[in-house]
UniProtKB/Swiss-Prot annotation:
Name of the protein in question: Basic phospholipase A2 homolog TM-N49
SUPFAM superfamilies tied to this protein: Phospholipase A2, PLA2
Residue ranges of coiled coil: none
Single GO MF descriptor: calcium ion binding
Family affiliation: Belongs to the phospholipase A2 family. Group II subfamily. N49 sub-subfamily.
Gene Ontology CC terms, in alphabetical order: extracellular region
Record field: transmembrane: none
Amino acid sequence: MRTLWIMAVLLLGVEGNLLQFRKMIKKMTGKEPILSYATYGCNCGMAGVGQPVDGTDRCCFVHNCCYEKVTSCSPKWDQYIYSWENGNIVCGEKNPCKKQICECDKAAAMCFRDNVKTYKKRNIFYPKSSCTEPTDTC
């Protein structure tokens, strides 16, 4: 619970990418991202480790891998430009690095939407001590 509180406080002051990502997830899934995904499974939240527990957790794994490929800017903090067109996210950033961040977030938000049926409340606050199988390579 303390981790959730810290994350909520941190996100209140964030005007960069994490807030944008939160808005994408909320619009795509209807779920409050901080409460629903920040501590979900083995790969969602601050430290992803181990095999994904389900499709939702796999979305986080893939998102983490996507962020690892972004090397010339800061994926968690750099703002980017995007819009909504007919219910779809359109990344409009001209800066290639920021566009890549937007595409990572867009793919994850769509993945959460597409895997909403795999989402299980029991995987919130999933014990990281249960994430013992080796992590897949990106």
